[in-house]
């Protein structure tokens, strides 16, 4: 801590605190100085390790540098985290950035308070005269998210280094509940934030009440999915949840004239401080069109062309585990148009047509379980299920491709769990990718799919099992219907 910062803190304490608070502040300053001294010793230790690395005593190709941090209470585990890479091609620019990222954020009360008010002023762009309980919630949540991101990023690097088998949990629902209190408990920071907010004149329970419940699920199916991804994080399993980022969720209930009225539950009215939009993670999802014979790398294949495309963009939320540094990912997909604006239609004065692609794309991720009593409703629901199944499978395939391993190893590194019937098109989508894009034979592709997927069945009642007419399926997903016929043909041949 610099002399200028120390003088500013002491000046504020003289003006706003009594003698007891001043003494407490001085104790905190001494602890900060002690932590800084320890940090300087750690840097010296790391510099000596770096010299050894340059002299060739370490692994030639690359090595991992793990720094100890200021993360209180878990010192014996710190060597597992804050990993960084060292390569032969020394880059002083990256070295400087890495040096500034070598420790965790502080967890003392004063640091937490600074973090909250800085987010209110600089992230939310609010003045000191505009602060209310909602802005305090937003600032608190963003402050907690900062500390989650440290563990989240470290977990992803740790997984990338060790390359274990990964679990992907596909569910059309995730009934998460409010996230702030769960995050604080998992980070062991609830008491610290409670004390910090008390000095702001607000109870932490009031902050909890400001959070909107994410409208991403309806009942037991979604709650089970949320419990699974939470438990897998606690069990230190490398897992991802895949679902849909709904704009309105299911519905908001109101009683008018003794009758139930349903209204959109726009849970995003106050924003969502937990999610991170991943503009670098997006995939094209096709609907309609037709299939034709083609060839790839001198090998005949089928090609799906025409129709319309939308873009699936990822929104990530950190899922912390309890009493562990492991922090997994819930990845939700939102639909965007491949061409958002038709300038020719707009210039002709046809403003509705100019934005029609944008509207059509937004319908897919608007509402959980759209009414399927009409033909258009059935089509929208099938679109919705294929949309998130396709984006999820493409994401998994894309990550595996980076390993440069044979496709026969795909089940050794990936397992996909399907939560009920809604994501079952993921099986056919993986078959399509392996057959049409990767050039595998039917036998190879089907073996990989069999070894990769698992399925949870929630009921055997016929009214709860989904059925789709061949006509609507063929119009919307022509190539997938061909693959289903192909699977059925080989199955019938096998059981003859």
What are these regions (language model features)?
Residues 1-16:
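N-terminal acidic, proline/glycine-rich, low-complexity intrinsically disordered segments
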């Amino acid at each position: 801590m610099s002399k200028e910062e120390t003088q500013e803190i002491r000046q504020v304490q003289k003006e706003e605190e009594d003698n007891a608070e001043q003494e407490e502040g001085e104790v905190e300053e001494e602890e900060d100085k002690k932590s800084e001294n320890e940090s300087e010793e750690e840097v010296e230790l790391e510099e000596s390790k770096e010299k050894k690395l340059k002299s060739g005593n370490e692994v030639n190709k690359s090595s991992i540098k793990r720094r100890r941090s200021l993360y209180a209470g878990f010192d014996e585990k710190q060597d597992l985290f804050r990993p960084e890479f060292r390569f032969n091609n020394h880059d002083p620019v990256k070295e400087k950035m890495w040096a500034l990222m070598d420790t965790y954020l502080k967890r003392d009360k004063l640091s937490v308070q600074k973090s909250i008010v800085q987010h209110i002023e600089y992230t939310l762009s609010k003045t000191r005269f505009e602060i209310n309980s909602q802005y305090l919630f937003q600032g608190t949540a963003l402050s907690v998210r900062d500390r989650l991101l440290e563990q989240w990023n470290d977990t992803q690097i740790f997984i990338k280094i060790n390359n274990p088998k990964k679990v992907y949990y596909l569910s059309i629902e995730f009934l998460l509940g409010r996230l702030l209190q769960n995050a604080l408990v998992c980070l062991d920071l609830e008491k610290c934030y409670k004390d910090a907010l008390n000095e702001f004149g607000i109870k932490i329970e009031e902050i909890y009440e400001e959070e909107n419940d994410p409208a991403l699920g309806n009942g037991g199916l979604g709650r089970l999915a949320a419990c699974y991804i939470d438990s897998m994080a606690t069990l230190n399993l490398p897992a991802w949840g895949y679902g849909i980022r709904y704009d309105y969720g299911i519905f908001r209930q109101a009683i008018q004239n003794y009758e139930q009225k349903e209204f959109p539950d726009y849970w995003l009215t106050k924003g969502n401080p937990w999610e991170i939009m991943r503009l670098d993670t997006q995939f094209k999802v096709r609907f309609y069109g037709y299939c034709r014979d083609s060839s790839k790398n001198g090998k005949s294949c089928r090609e799906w062309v025409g129709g319309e495309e939308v873009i699936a963009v990822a929104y990530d939320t950190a899922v912390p585990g309890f009493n562990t540094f492991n922090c997994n990912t819930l990845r939700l997909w939102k639909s965007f148009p491949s061409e958002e604006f038709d300038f020719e239609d707009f210039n002709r004065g046809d403003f509705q047509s100019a934005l029609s692609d944008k509207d059509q794309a937004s319908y897919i991720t608007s509402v959980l379980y759209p009414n399927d009593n009409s033909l258009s409703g059935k089509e929208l629901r099938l679109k919705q299920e294929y949309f998130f199944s396709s984006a999820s499978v493409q994401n998994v395939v894309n990550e595996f491709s980076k390993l440069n391993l044979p496709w026969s190893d795909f089940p050794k590194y990936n397992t996909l769990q399907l939560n009920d019937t809604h994501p079952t098109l993921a099986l056919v989508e993986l078959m399509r990718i392996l057959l049409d894009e990767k050039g595998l034979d039917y036998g190879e592709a089907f073996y990989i799919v069999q070894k990769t997927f698992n399925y949870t069945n929630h009921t055997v009642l016929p009214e709860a099992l989904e059925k789709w007419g061949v006509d609507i399926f063929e119009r919307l997903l022509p190539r997938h219907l061909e693959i289903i016929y192909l699977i059925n043909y080989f199955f019938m041949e096998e059981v003859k």
